[in-house]
Structures are given as C-alpha cells and as structure tokens.
Amino acid sequence: MQSELQRGFVLHRRPYSETSLLVDLFTEESGRLTVIAKGARAKRSSWKSVLQPFTPLLLRWTGKSTLKTLTKAEPAAITLPLQQIALYSGFYVNELLTRVIESETPNPALFQHYLKCLTGLATETNVEPTLRLFEFQLLQMLGYGVDFLHCAGSGEPVDFSMTYRYREEKGFVASLVKDNLTFYGRDLLAFEALDFSDDAVRQAAKRFTRIALKPYLGDKPLKSRELFTQNILLLK
C-alpha cells in the first residue's frame, strides 16, 4: 500500500546491504518509521545526498510491515544550516526522538515542535533555550504529567523562594535538603510557563529533563552526548 506524500526528516541512517540504506524517518502524519532506501548507496543514486538529517523532505513509501520501502524522497526546502554546537544539538534531538517515541504513532503537534526546534537551532546564538523548550514539549507529548505549581506534600502553591525536592511519580515536595533532586520554587514556576530566558532556570531545567527522561531512555548512554563530549574542545 502506497502512502500519501508526507513532509518529514531523516533522524538516522545506516548501511543496509551493499547498495541500500536503512533510514529512520520522522514524518508529520505517520510519526517515526523505518524504511529501506533501495540503491541509495549506489554511486549514481540521487538519494545519497537527499537523505540527510535536517533537510525538510517530501516522502512516500510502501509496505504493510513495520519495515517499509521508500519510493520517493525529494527536498521540500534547503537543509537547515546547523553548525558546531547547533549541529551536535540537532543530533541529540534526533536521537531523543529515535529512542523515546513509539514507531508509527502519528503526532503532528510534536512534528511542529521539532521543526521549530531545528529552526531555532539554526538561527539562535544560544541553543540552550531552544533545547530546553523542546525537551519539555517532548515530555508533555509522552504523557509525562507533573504539577509545577503545587507542593505534592501539602497541596500549597509553590513559593518562589523555597526549595522543593523531586520525587518520581509524586511531584515536588518542600524540602530543606539540597541535592541534585532539589529545585527552587522560581525554577518550577518558570518550568510551568516554559520560560527559559534565565540562565539559572536553564541549568535547572537541563538537570530536571535528564531526570525525567531517564525512565524513557533507560541506562543506555546517548551517543550524541558522548560525541559532543569528545569534540567539545574543538568547538571552543
């Protein structure tokens, strides 16, 4: 069965036989799926240059199984110019999607968040606000629900100047203990507003999303994070 023409992006690609590629796609209407791009590794294949991350594509495929066969791939726009830290950040976002969202689960809203994230990475000087916003949006799409506005212990509204300790599957409880699981009330209020304009809030948000995403990612390290760490000196 031939699919409708859809907008999408390449998340990851790897060799499949001598002449083909196995490609993870993220599409607007069908979500994440894996396709075989037959002949894409051949010298004269036009797909070799087209099937690249961060290039908006128009795609069509066929097949009823979980592994589809790509039948059409053409650029819908120019490749988003991600360079240096923005490029590694793009790899990180792609790996997140590959690891945490279920295959063939339509999510047009998440596709729009992803598109805005890539655009932000390509245009903004500081990539951190863009990354933190996408991580929180991804958590929302995964059904992750936590109340940033109330103390999980007392039900009282979060106080701007107090500290709260995160408890998995429960929320934030007022606490005088300060460790990796502790956040200021002002951080939680900013999280609720998706306001990552302040540097201290961004650092707290990064710490929180690592905690919140761990159950979805498991113990396997993110390759994109390792790659960034290995090359960080070259980026400075």
Swiss-Prot record:
<dbReference type="Pfam" id="PF11967">
    <property type="entry name" value="RecO_N"/>
</dbReference>
<dbReference type="InterPro" id="IPR003717">
    <property type="entry name" value="RecO"/>
</dbReference>
<dbReference type="GO" id="GO:0006310">
    <property type="term" value="P:DNA recombination"/>
</dbReference>
<dbReference type="GO" id="GO:0043590">
    <property type="term" value="C:bacterial nucleoid"/>
</dbReference>
<dbReference type="InterPro" id="IPR022572">
    <property type="entry name" value="DNA_rep/recomb_RecO_N"/>
</dbReference>
<dbReference type="Pfam" id="PF02565">
    <property type="entry name" value="RecO_C"/>
</dbReference>
<dbReference type="GO" id="GO:0006302">
    <property type="term" value="P:double-strand break repair"/>
</dbReference>
<keyword id="KW-0233">DNA recombination</keyword>
<comment type="similarity">
    <text>Belongs to the RecO family.</text>
</comment>
<dbReference type="InterPro" id="IPR037278">
    <property type="entry name" value="ARFGAP/RecO"/>
</dbReference>
<comment type="function">
    <text>Involved in DNA repair and RecF pathway recombination.</text>
</comment>
<protein>
    <recommendedName>
        <fullName>DNA repair protein RecO</fullName>
    </recommendedName>
</protein>
<keyword id="KW-0234">DNA repair</keyword>
<dbReference type="InterPro" id="IPR042242">
    <property type="entry name" value="RecO_C"/>
</dbReference>
<keyword id="KW-0227">DNA damage</keyword>
<dbReference type="InterPro" id="IPR012340">
    <property type="entry name" value="NA-bd_OB-fold"/>
</dbReference>
